[in-house]
Amino acid sequence: MSKKTFPSFKFRGGCFNLLFKGSVDVSIKTRMKRIQINLILTIACIQLSTESQPTPVSITELYTSAATRKPDPAVAPTSAASRKPDPAVAPTSAASRKPDPAVAPTSAASRKPDPAVAPTSAATRKPDPAVAPTSAASRKPDPAVAPTSAATRKPDPAVAPTSAASRKPDPAANTQHSQPPFLYENIQCVHGGIQSIPYFHTFIMPCYMRLTTGQQAAFKQQQKTYEQYSLDPEGSNITRWKSLIRPDLHIEVWFTRHLIDPHRQLGNALIRMPDLPVMLYSNSADLNLINNPEIFTHAKENYVIPDVKTTSDFSVTILSMDATTEGTYIWRVVNTKTKNVISEHSITVTTYYRPNITVVGDPVLTGQTYAAYCNVSKYYPPHSVRVRWTSRFGNIGKNFITDAIQEYANGLFSYVSAVRIPQQKQMDYPPPAIQCNVLWIRDGVSNMKYSAVVTPDVYPFPNVSIGIIDGHIVCTAKCVPRGVVHFVWWVNDSPINHENSEITGVCDQNKRFVNMQSSCPTSELDGPITYSCHLDGYPKKFPPFSAVYTYDASTYATTFSVVAVIIGVISILGTLGLIAVIATLCIRCCS
């Protein structure tokens, strides 16, 4: 065995580095074995480094499906490793290219043995004496043997040079490269689910068209508001505007109004039943809403809808939330030809208005029915108010309660509940305290509770009398409220400005009330004069309390003169009679 000195050589690849250097005593068989191992490792690294990479998709390919897109002849095919291809060389990946029958397989695992060579393993087969034992780095390729390196082999003239980005997959081949992403257009809105907006408020629903790739699952939104630049499809250098939405698609906006069913309720939540859907917007020429005056007028008066030429911003603005604009809004991307819905987005909008609640008690007279009223005014949604009456004796029965609901022109509602309780002897005083309990259901989550207590005012019937005392007309009222009631005098159906009243005592039946008296001077005019005394200050629903007296000054004077004459005559006759009696007695005495 002779001592040989081998030159230094390196095998470099993406996965390993090998370096053999030194002077060793080896046999020819051992040297050939090492060379074969190095060749196998080199071929494996070349195969790994030339694997195909995912093919990037340009923005111009976004509107073309993967099944129909053709390669741009003006674009040079490039491999994933960014090498510049030789026009004569087909840049195909090792994983997907078909072997040339005239080329020997380059992989140790896949190449077929030469019939002229005995099928021996790499570890045991003997080298060909006709082949000089040279290293892999320095040996020259055999003209009869096809080059085994992807970087150095020449293409087969029978094979068409194709790029990795443009070649069509062979159905029979096991293709491993990634397919271009599938593109579809999607409508996306800022809001979603259920939105609760106050009554009469403005609500904006921003919605935009976006491009979605199925493979990358990413959104690509256009930077421009309506349209984007693209090359003219005829291939000229002139640029023009191209719509973001595909020409075979169009956008529709539908509205379904909600109607509340008063007979259905889930807990405190109101059941809203959908009405017939109405189309508010469409940018399709076949469905242009301008041709439908009724729908177009409704949309124009209640909404700000997108322009028919827009291709990106499909936002809708509700000018004023009310009963007519409450419901579900649906945006749909529709295929114009097949009518299939590509994508859709819905927003349910509800509205509410907080009510104003007042509770008042109705004043009554002793013996009349107690009454109280609970007024829940201007609320929304309808059928969202619950009223319950209670007193110190418990819940008040429904047979004493009367309810009434009124709807206003603007869609709001009012609810009036009245309770009437007959008086009983044991309830005359003090009067019962009546409580109104209100529950307003805004939606299935929020509600408001309100309660108020009212005590009816009970008044006894006043006793009013009138007469003349010492030349004055005197009016007396018994059992009237202190500081509330005052006297009003009328003479011959005309009010007079005369205030003269005083408290003379307390009411015998109820010490909370007093007795009062007022007087008015008589007139000296002849003829009958009517004096009336009215009690002012009682609730308007009470009947009037008054007393009337007629006085005639001339009749009073005539009556006085006749009486005076009669008295004078009687006095004279009496005097004469007395004189006659005295004279008679004197005559008798003298006799």
Curated annotation (Swiss-Prot):
<feature type="glycosylation site" description="N-linked (GlcNAc...) asparagine; by host">
    <location>
        <position position="237"/>
    </location>
</feature>
<dbReference type="GO" id="GO:0016020">
    <property type="term" value="C:membrane"/>
</dbReference>
<feature type="glycosylation site" description="N-linked (GlcNAc...) asparagine; by host">
    <location>
        <position position="375"/>
    </location>
</feature>
<feature type="disulfide bond">
    <location>
        <begin position="189"/>
        <end position="207"/>
    </location>
</feature>
<dbReference type="GO" id="GO:0046718">
    <property type="term" value="P:symbiont entry into host cell"/>
</dbReference>
<keyword id="KW-1161">Viral attachment to host cell</keyword>
<dbReference type="InterPro" id="IPR036179">
    <property type="entry name" value="Ig-like_dom_sf"/>
</dbReference>
<comment type="similarity">
    <text>Belongs to the herpesviridae glycoprotein C family.</text>
</comment>
<keyword id="KW-1087">Inhibition of host complement factors by virus</keyword>
<keyword id="KW-0946">Virion</keyword>
<feature type="disulfide bond">
    <location>
        <begin position="475"/>
        <end position="533"/>
    </location>
</feature>
<feature type="topological domain" description="Cytoplasmic">
    <location>
        <begin position="583"/>
        <end position="591"/>
    </location>
</feature>
<keyword id="KW-0899">Viral immunoevasion</keyword>
<keyword id="KW-0472">Membrane</keyword>
<dbReference type="GO" id="GO:0042784">
    <property type="term" value="P:symbiont-mediated suppression of host complement activation"/>
</dbReference>
<keyword id="KW-1015">Disulfide bond</keyword>
<feature type="glycosylation site" description="N-linked (GlcNAc...) asparagine; by host">
    <location>
        <position position="356"/>
    </location>
</feature>
<dbReference type="Pfam" id="PF02124">
    <property type="entry name" value="Marek_A"/>
</dbReference>
<feature type="glycosylation site" description="N-linked (GlcNAc...) asparagine; by host">
    <location>
        <position position="463"/>
    </location>
</feature>
<comment type="function">
    <text>Essential for the initial attachment to heparan sulfate moieties of the host cell surface proteoglycans.</text>
</comment>
<keyword id="KW-1233">Viral attachment to host adhesion receptor</keyword>
<feature type="topological domain" description="Virion surface">
    <location>
        <begin position="1"/>
        <end position="561"/>
    </location>
</feature>
<keyword id="KW-0812">Transmembrane</keyword>
<dbReference type="InterPro" id="IPR001038">
    <property type="entry name" value="GA_GC"/>
</dbReference>
<keyword id="KW-0325">Glycoprotein</keyword>
<dbReference type="InterPro" id="IPR013783">
    <property type="entry name" value="Ig-like_fold"/>
</dbReference>
<protein>
    <recommendedName>
        <fullName>Envelope glycoprotein C</fullName>
    </recommendedName>
</protein>
<feature type="disulfide bond">
    <location>
        <begin position="479"/>
        <end position="507"/>
    </location>
</feature>
<keyword id="KW-1160">Virus entry into host cell</keyword>
<dbReference type="GO" id="GO:0098671">
    <property type="term" value="P:adhesion receptor-mediated virion attachment to host cell"/>
</dbReference>
<dbReference type="GO" id="GO:0055036">
    <property type="term" value="C:virion membrane"/>
</dbReference>
<keyword id="KW-0945">Host-virus interaction</keyword>
<feature type="disulfide bond">
    <location>
        <begin position="374"/>
        <end position="436"/>
    </location>
</feature>
<feature type="transmembrane region" description="Helical">
    <location>
        <begin position="562"/>
        <end position="582"/>
    </location>
</feature>
<feature type="region of interest" description="Disordered">
    <location>
        <begin position="70"/>
        <end position="179"/>
    </location>
</feature>
<keyword id="KW-1133">Transmembrane helix</keyword>
